[in-house]
Amino acid sequence: MLTDTQIREIRSRFNIFKHKIYLNSCSQGPLSDAVQAGLEDFMASWHEHGSPWELWVNRYEAARAAFAQFINASPDEVAIVTSVSAGINGVASALNFQERNKVVMGEFEFPTMGHVWLGQRVRGAEVQFVSAEGNCIPAANYEKMVDRNTLIVPLTHVCFKNGFRSEVNAITQIAHRAGALVMLDDYQDCGTRPIDVKAMDLDFFVTGTLKYLLGPPGLAFMYVRQELIASLVPTVTGWFAQANPFAYDPKLFDLSPTARRFESGSPSVPNVYAALPGFQLLREIGMEKVAAHIKKLVQSLLSCAHDLGIRAKTPADSAGPLVVLQCQDSTSFVQKLAESNIVASNRHDGLRISFHVYNTMDDVTAVVEVLKKNIDLMVRGPARVGSYD
């Protein structure tokens, strides 16, 4: 468990906490001194050398190796892409919908996941959505729909609008028993607890750096299980997907034998420089400690909301780093928080409060005080069962 002194030291590395209470890591993580130094390092290399591509590519590969270690994968199983959307599109373009054509996903997915797979209907995909029960989607609901005609099960780890954490292990087992692939979107969780893609038995894993990995927008990582790589030929591609990008031969289509075949154009070098320190900072702290600290904060806010009679959209027994409370007017409540120098966000009727390792129990107390003063803006009573509103 992290001590108060350790948390204060971590918090001091993020300038925003000098004047704000920041509880919006589910949208964008705050800027640390380490990430700022990474960006300045890139600027210095650009000023000094102009176009030091050998240096930049080395840093690019260092980021790949760091992320691979972060999720217990091989660097050859990791693609660096511009966004999670780009990674998902790359995988979708490589799949054949002739023998199996069903894509089964929950209705809590981020819109990109639905849009990408619905876009594959012109190639023969049949997209089916698993219905929720209240603010949860039980694994049993997937079992009713996944069958021998299912090609892939795209799955969000933590829902962006209610904080529900999916039963990843159970759903993965259901999919694999039917011979289907599993893709996990971990954007709303990665960086808040240890991740082991091998232990989770995943086929694909995608996440970006801008939230809990404490990095910039414009950079994402995708894991592809080693045994699958050679059989997948993405048609969403580019020169950095080739075995030798620097061959400069437009007549040669020679994909990398590694997950790099899912990459595309020139890498976003500034974002690579900024992302690497985010990984390093989290690893220095220790992911087990990060997870334990976040869990304590989440449980505290959920308990306080319960005591105030406020309806939580986040199930207490399956929560990630994001707590969502139901509002009469979520936009107005976010403004009320802003008036107290608290940064949060909303989606539909949900107030989103997200925690990370730099947050404290004092942050929870500050939110609770605003809740008490504006209780009329909140929805009262227990969470509804049987509908997601």
Describe every region a protein language model picked out.
Residues 1-389:
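Pyridoxal 5′-phosphate
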